Regions:
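C-terminal motif of bacterial Sec signal peptides marking the signal peptidase cleavage site
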Residues: 14-16
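Basic, polyanion-binding surface patches
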Residues: 24-225
C-alpha cells in the first residue's frame, strides 16, 4: 500500500511538471477533458466526496496542553498497514495536541452517540476546551498511550503517532479495547451490537451500518464451481 501511494505521488508530480500554461488554462482543460455521457447513468463529474461514500465516523481524542480531553470527528480514515491507520486531517486543535503528545485514541461513533459525535465535529477545542464534559461524556486515561479514552464509545484504538505531515496522520495501533456490551458469546467484537454510523456525503447525513448480508470469502464461491 505504501509503495502504491508513493508511486501515485511521483506520477502526480511528474504530470504537474510536464504541464504548460496552455494546459493549465481552465478553459483549455474543460475543452480537452470534456466528459462523455455513460449510457443509462448520470454523470457527476470528478466529485470524489461522493465516490468514497459512505465514510467512517472516527472520533479522535487527545490531551491538550492543560490535560483537558479533546475529541473531534473525522471521516477520511482507513487501514494503512497491519497495525497502522491513516487519517487525512487539516489543522485542528487535535493536530496541535498530537504534535505535542505523540499519541491519540480513535473510537467509532454509533447510533447511541450521534448527537454528541456530531457536536464534537461542530465545536473546536480552541473555543470550547471543556466540550467533552459539556456533552456529558467521561474519560479514562489510556494506560498504554498518552491520550484519553472516551468511555461512552465502546470500541477504541490506542495509537502512537508514526508520522504527521502534509495533512496525513499515520498512527500505530498499540491496543484495541472493547466494552463488554459489544462482545458476542465467544468474546469477539460484534458490529451488530456496536451499530456504528457512517457519513453519507451525498445526503449529508449519518447512516447506521446494517445487518450481515453475506460471508466474506464465501458468498461468491458459487461462481467458482
Amino acid at each position: 500500500m505504501k509503495r502504491i501511494l508513493t508511486l501515485m505521488a511521483v506520477l502526480s508530480l511528474l504530470a504537474s511538471c510536464g504541464t504548460d500554461k496552455k494546459t493549465n488554462n481552465p478553459e483549455n482543460m474543460n475543452k480537452n477533458e470534456a466528459l462523455q455521457e455513460v449510457a443509462g447513468r448520470k454523470n457527476f463529474g470528478p466529485n470524489h466526496a461522493l465516490v468514497t461514500t459512505p465514510q467512517p465516523c472516527v472520533m479522535i481524542a487527545t490531551w491538550d496542553e492543560n490535560k483537558n480531553p479533546d475529541v473531534m470527528m473525522a471521516a477520511w480514515a482507513g487501514q494503512y498497514d497491519a497495525r497502522q491507520i491513516v487519517i487525512s486531517l487539516s489543522k485542528h486543535k487535535t493536530t496541535d495536541n498530537l504534535e505535542k503528545t505523540k499519541a491519540f485514541t480513535v473510537s467509532f461513533a454509533d447510533e447511541r452517540t450521534v448527537a454528541e459525535s456530531d457536536y464534537f465535529g461542530l465545536v473546536s477545542g480552541n473555543n470550547v476546551p471543556n466540550k467533552v464534559a459539556r456533552a456529558g461524556f467521561t474519560i479514562t486515561p489510556s494506560p498504554n498511550v498518552n491520550a484519553p479514552i472516551i468511555n461512552e464509545y465502546p470500541l477504541t484504538l490506542e495509537c502512537k503517532v508514526v508520522s504527521w505531515s502534509d495533512g496525513i496522520l499515520v498512527g500505530e495501533v498499540v491496543n484495541m479495547s472493547a466494552d463488554d456490551c459489544i462482545l458476542d458469546d465467544d468474546g469477539h467484537i460484534d458490529l451488530g451490537k456496536l451499530k456504528p454510523i457512517v457519513f453519507d456525503a451525498a445526503a449529508m447525513a449519518y447512516r447506521s451500518v446494517g445487518e450481515i448480508v453475506g460471508k466474506a470469502w464465501g458468498a461468491g464461491k458459487a461462481f467458482t464451481e
